[in-house]
Amino acid sequence: MSRVGRVERTTKETSVLVEIDLDGSGKVDVSTGVGFYDHMLDQLGRHGLFDLTVKTEGDLHIDSHHTIEDTALALGAAFKQALGDKVGIYRFGNCTVPLDESLAQVTVDLSGRPYLVHTEPENMAPMIGEYDTTMTRHILESFVAQAQIALHVHVPYGRNAHHIVECQFKALARALRYASERDPRAAGILPSTKGAL
């Protein structure tokens, strides 16, 4: 059974198309107009082994906020759609990823209950190119709200802002991959004692 999610979201601020195949091979085609964000979404697809298409046109003449936020909302909704009934998945996933001096620890529960815990070093550089580093948390908040997952992201240390953000996306990719993969020992079983996720 195909596990593909496709979401189109159009407002006066943005036009977004996201398609994700959870059982892909890491093929990525991303264009948001925000170079560093494209780079992070590329990490998400490649390290999650998700086939990921993202096409966003936004009001970048103002700034990148709406473009980044609406893309994350659509991505979360597409991920939830692709998960389907969640029967037979592992449900939980975690991964720790270093990037030189930075380290990210990510744990996810595909629980149906949106919750985010996010910590990263203070006093990060405010910008990476056109990317506002305060948007990383907002991306995760937006994704979690629509995907309806519990997500814990912890960066205990790091100096370079690029590395701090990138290791979060890489660890998130792997954690989502592990949680969403099918468990051969649990075929046909919903991973919940209450019978619903």
Curated annotation (Swiss-Prot):
Chief location of this protein within or outside the cell: cytoplasm
Entries under InterPro entries matching the protein: IGPD_sf, ImidazoleglycerolP_deHydtase, ImidazoleglycerP_deHydtase_CS, Ribosomal_Su5_D2-typ_SF
Database matches in Pfam families: IGPD (PF00475)
Highest taxon in the source lineage: Bacteria
Enzyme class: lyase
Catalyzed reactions: D-erythro-1-(imidazol-4-yl)glycerol 3-phosphate = 3-(imidazol-4-yl)-2-oxopropyl phosphate + H2O
GO CC annotation, single: cytoplasm
EC numbers: 4.2.1.19
Compartments where located: Cytoplasm
Keywords: Amino-acid biosynthesis, Cytoplasm, Histidine biosynthesis, Lyase
Associated pathway: Amino-acid biosynthesis; L-histidine biosynthesis; L-histidine from 5-phospho-alpha-D-ribose 1-diphosphate: step 6/9
HAMAP family, sorted: HisB
Name of the protein in question: Imidazoleglycerol-phosphate dehydratase
Recorded name of the encoding gene: hisB
